[in-house]
From Swiss-Prot:
Function: Part of the ABC transporter complex MetNIQ involved in methionine import. Responsible for energy coupling to the transport system.
ABC transporter domain ranges (all copies): 2-241
Assembly notes: The complex is composed of two ATP-binding proteins (MetN), two transmembrane proteins (MetI) and a solute-binding protein (MetQ).
Compartment annotation: Cell membrane
Membrane topology: Peripheral membrane protein
Binding residues for ATP: G38, F39, S40, G41, A42, G43, K44, S45
Protein name per its UniProtKB record: Methionine import ATP-binding protein MetN 1
Organism: Bacillus thuringiensis subsp. konkukian (strain 97-27)
Keywords: Amino-acid transport, ATP-binding, Cell membrane, Membrane, Nucleotide-binding, Translocase, Transport
Protein encoded by which gene: metN1
Length: 339
């Protein structure tokens, strides 16, 4: 659907070259929700602006449906942009227009007949749950309602792609969840390809099928959501994951390790999370199991669990228990310097 092929964007600033995007190669499949996460200045927003040619790449090509969009004429670009909807952190609504007027605006620009505009806008108002707000102005709406208007406006011309630029960053947690659920509904019912950028890993966790991590203009990690969360390879990705899965060792656990305690990290995935493995080893081996920390989250309908346990007993019995655990779950001894 969308392909970035060795894409770079360089700006000249004060006689120096600034690489906002550097040699990025990515593919976004049709109908998926693809997240791009990174800290401020990572190049996320620049990469998004390249998709609808608000910025042109310095090098490389960008393709949509196997067509190189970097070589399109001005007329062809206008047509392309009708296929791409966009929502923003700051909503970007017209304060002088009603909710109906805001949603109708792109349809008027496209010279859609009035009766069709009315039908389409009413359909979208129902879809986003704002049927009773058609005649309200933006200042009369909450932040979540404004973003719903933004989503409806972005969908007005029936685009194939929806770009989300930090769409939930200005919202409270409860409203963020509501907007993410609405975006999942958009993806599911319209089969829309969604490309979103964020600095919030919990947003990626809730909505994305795949994710790319950017740092200093480069993609440093990319893959399926479950793989990136459960096996992060880079330090930056690990830090993002820890904002959702807190696996830092508490001071009390570190103290136990430093005092000679045998601490192990057990990782469970899928059906493994429901197995009574700790109960089994406690009953069948002469060891005591002390659970120090644990959590379970759901990633794309697959459970992922993380436990820190201390095993106490004779060394021979502990080794037998560990041998059994290795057959059931991923197991790693925690070192004193771990954090």
């Amino acid at each position: 659907m969308i392909s970035f092929n060795n894409v770079s964007k360089v700006y000249e600033s004060g006689g120096q070259s600034v690489h906002a995007v550097e040699d990025v190669t990515l593919s976004v499949e049709k109908g998926e929700i693809f997240g791009i996460i990174g800290f401020s200045g990572a190049g996320k927003s620049t990469l998004l602006r390249l998709v609808n040619m608000l910025e042109r790449p310095t090098a490389g090509t960008i393709s949509i449906d196997d067509k190189d969009i970097t070589s399109l004429s001005t007329k062809e670009l206008r047509k392309l942009r009708q296929r791409i909807g966009m929502i923003f952190q700051s909503f970007n609504l017209f304060n002088s227009r009603t909710v109906f007027g805001n949603i109708a605006y792109p349809l008027k620009l496209a010279k859609v007949p009035k009766n069709e505009i009315k039908e389409r806008v009413n359909e979208l108002l129902k879809f986003v749950g704002l049927e009773d707000k058609a005649n309200n102005y933006p200042e009369q709406l909450s932040g979540g309602q404004k973003q719903r208007v933004g989503i409806a406006r972005a969908l007005a011309t029936s685009p194939d792609i929806l770009i989300c630029d930090e769409a939930t960053s200005a919202l409270d947690p409860e409203t963020t969840t509501e907007i993410l659920n609405l975006l999942k509904k958009v993806n599911r019912e319209y089969n829309l390809t969604i490309l979103l950028i964020t600095h919030e890993m919990h947003v990626v966790k809730e909505i994305c099928h795949r994710v790319a991590v950017m740092e200093k203009g480069k993609v440093i990690e990319e893959g399926k959501l479950f793989d990136v969360f459960t096996q992060p390879k880079t330090k930056t990705t690990q830090n993002f994951v820890r904002s959702v899965i807190n696996d830092h060792l508490p001071e009390s656990v570190l103290a136990k390790i430093q005092n000679g305690g045998q601490i192990y990290r057990l990782t469970f995935t899928g059906e493994e999370t429901g197995q009574p493995v700790l109960s089994y080893i406690a009953k069948n081996y002469n060891v005591d199991v002390n659970v120090l920390y644990g959590n379970i989250i759901e990633l794309q309908n697959v459970l992922f669990g993380n436990l820190l346990v201390e095993l106490q007993g004779e060394q021979r019995e502990i080794q037998k228990a560990l041998q059994h655990l290795r057959l059931q779950v991923q197991l790693k001894e925690v070192e004193a310097h771990a954090s």
